[in-house]
Amino acid sequence: MAKHIVELTDALSNKIAAGEVVERPASVVKELVENAIDAGSTVIDILVEEAGLNKITIIDNGSGIEEEDVATAFLRHATSKIKNEADLFRVHTLGFRGEALPSIASVSHLEMETSTGEAKGTTISLEGGKIIEQKSGHARKGTQIEVSQLFFNTPARLKYLKSLPTELGNITDILNRLALAHPDISFRFSHNGKPLLQTNGNGDLRQVIAAIYGVSIAKKSVPVKAESLDFKISGYAVLPEVNRSNRNYISTIINGRFIKNFALVKAIQEGYHTLLPIGRFPIIVLQIEMDPIIVDVNVHPAKLEVRLSKEKELGQLISQMIKETFHKLQLIPDGEISKKQKEDQKSEQIQISFEEKKPVKETPTLFSKPTIPEYVPSDEDAPREDDFILETMPSYEPESQAEQEEHTKERIPKMYPIGQMHATYIFAQNENGLYIIDQHAAQERIKYEFYREKIGEVSRELQELLVPIVLEFPADEYVRLEEQKAKLEEVGVFLENFGQNSFIIRAHPTWFPKDQEEEMLREIIDEALSAPSISIHKLREDTAIMMSCKKSIKANHYLTTQDMEALLDTLREASDPFTCPHGRPVIIQYSTYELEKMFKRVM
């Protein structure tokens, strides 16, 4: 009788593994570049043709592979990075599973030339995972891997690939993240001979941000850092005035590995809370160092997802760090920000031509087969003008306690109202220039901070009602409110059972608007019903935002000069006067110099 359960061949096993490890050309680039990083490379060249479908070449100046280990490197689960089970819980390298090379080789034509620099090198060629030839090669230290005809033996995989621009975008995104994670390595990336990314490898993260996102973004970035017993965080956060429509510009790096973690992204967004408009996201790069024992990278073959044993503590540290950083800064955007923001948004969509295949001028580092040249400085290594611009950017040093207290008192300067536009915007001036204030957003911020404080101490300030309020609900809502009573009490709503499907309310906070008590109670109860699992903190926050929005002066509301003066003076006392609770700007400024430049009084 024939056996029904059989052991799969190595070739078939490698193809199955390739399905998890090698999803698209970007996966090949990621795995090979990570190998180059683990090899201690200081310069890595990435040459791609036709978005990687035609050819991918990775060249490094790392440690290389010994001749006797070259063939072994293409066996499944063969690796030099871990030796035993204990090592699996203290992974210090980007790769460790021993799956990348055999998986890539099984679905492509692959040629590798490598040398440790101490003896002759080795060249090996594989097709579909089978070794075709192995011979002596050049002795220059480093490794060059060329992958061509990707997915030649798995045509079904080709059907699921996206357009060439999309696949190239995936490769670019991977390399951007790796460059941000390793500013001490020089990355050179070209497509069809056209350079797309170059970093100088001098260890300056801000220079890498400039190379990837542009100098204008780097100028708007401020250093962030925090430390606890378990974590050390550093990086750059871009000012809230510059933001994006998606989360792609949030980069979290743990021990040199770019990772995706929803909880950490949520913590970052919490740090920017009320500083960004709804639906907008920050630009931020965080490098996090921790003991490998508290991070599990062995979750998925792609190694993008990780498990953290102290995830909540790390999230709280990140949120607090971002809040404290921006609380020390004056966040009044200049009058040009709207124009810059639109230009930045246009630059998010980069169109890449696939017709032009003429190579740019050859440099000593982007070399052709079969020689691995020395990595000598070229003109492209020389400092760029952008580098000098970045050197002049202001640094943000930690302030003393006295300076912080003074800064908190004077977050925005004294302004003198000179008029109102469309009964919506207040125009004000001082010696620094012209200010335009959104009157609704300004009062919304003031009232939000008032309600946020009051909601936290509702039990101390209650007003007994002469005529209690009775509220009736459908049966399903009544049952759900029974479960939410404790939460509602935290925001000033005290429900007592009063007959079938009814509650009676005998008191409310004194800060409820007069003659609008029942309306406010209904609003808060609806908020709790719409999100049954809402936390007390979030319910308080949402209640404060809702009340501040409804009770603030609206657009098309004329104000007297005295009203405007009072509003601006009260705004100066707010802890975060620059945005409304929804993240919209409260105030923008045109400096005297900018105005004089507009009118050509200065050149």
From Swiss-Prot:
PROSITE patterns linked to this entry: DNA_MISMATCH_REPAIR_1 (PS00058)
Gene Ontology molecular function terms on file: ATP binding; ATP hydrolysis activity; ATP-dependent DNA damage sensor activity; mismatched DNA binding
Keywords: DNA damage, DNA repair
Record CDD domains: HATPase_MutL-MLH-PMS-like, MutL_Trans
One GO cellular component, as annotated: mismatch repair complex
Entry superkingdom: Bacteria
Gene3D superfamilies the UniProt entry points to: 3.30.230.10, Histidine kinase-like ATPase, C-terminal domain, MutL, C-terminal domain, dimerisation subdomain, MutL, C-terminal domain, regulatory subdomain
Pfam assignment, any one: MutL_C
Region annotated Disordered, chain positions: 361-383
GO annotation (BP), single: mismatch repair
Chain's role: This protein is involved in the repair of mismatches in DNA. It is required for dam-dependent methyl-directed DNA mismatch repair. May act as a 'molecular matchmaker', a protein that promotes the formation of a stable complex between two or more DNA-binding proteins in an ATP-dependent manner without itself being part of a final effector complex.
Family designation: Belongs to the DNA mismatch repair MutL/HexB family.
UniProt cross-references to NCBIfam families, sorted A to Z: mutl
UniProt name for this protein: DNA mismatch repair protein MutL
Organism expressing this protein natively: Listeria monocytogenes serotype 4b (strain CLIP80459)
